[in-house]
Amino acid sequence: MARETIIHVEDFTAAYEGSVILSEVNFDVYAGEVFVILGGSGCGKSTLLKHMIGLYKPARGRILIDGADVVAADRQERMDILRKFGVMYQSGALFGSMTLLDNVRLPLEEFTDLPPEAIRLIALMKLKQVGLAGFDNHLPSALSGGMQKRAAIARAMALDPRVLFLDEPSAGLDPITSAELDELIVSLARNLKMTFVIVSHELASIFAIADRVIMLDKKVKGIVAAGKPRELRETSDNPWVRQFFSRQASLDG
């Protein structure tokens, strides 16, 4: 049975002030998988993510989310596309003066016509799904970094998106908290049938959560390897893969 393609990136090229950052990138993301965009600093990971969610238009190419063209969409079509995905940026970006409940309510108030009580109940359910039941009236400053990340994921899930984009979700977390967040991501993907697209450079997280990986390289300006993470590490003869894993091992050591 053919897998459902939820994201299709075709001949994608990104440029900034005349300089090409990524060139002729092609890949698909399948529904229900955890898909990781891996690479070192400056390779274009976050640039690719920002184009995928429609913040920028590529120099060339197409990006389809659930069949809708992010690049060619008009205003109404873009609003429809926005409902299909949620985003958690690296900072988490919770509003510090608002409770967790109010933070999670924001997308529902902005993009739906639901009555206040229905919005409140949905927001409470999202907090429960990320392990934050009972913390709805807490301010972000009262929570640990890991709990703030969970709250940011809950907000990104508010509209029941088909895809969640996470930019370096483990950034700033200690190894134990990072592992707990990995477990949450896998649980959400499997139990809620959600698709995750994650930008990361951390190997431990990748092997814990990823179904498939693409590896970007700054010099090549594109994909140098793609596949299941353990296959890349254990069986690949790709020199770019070996170099990346060797560099990461030395940093971890």
Q: Model-predicted segments: where are they?
A:
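Catalytic Walker B motif of ABC-type/P-loop ATPase nucleotide-binding domains
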Residues: 164-167
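Conserved ABC ATPase "signature" region
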Residues: 69, 116-134
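Helix-to-loop junction immediately C-terminal to a conserved catalytic motif
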Residues: 53
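ABC ATPase NBD coupling module
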Residues: 70-86, 116, 232-236
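Conserved beta-strand-loop-alpha-helix hinge in the C-terminal portion
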Residues: 219-245
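A short, proline-enriched helix->beta-strand linker immediately N-terminal to the Walker B motif
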Residues: 158-162
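Conserved ABC ATPase signature
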Residues: 139-143, 147
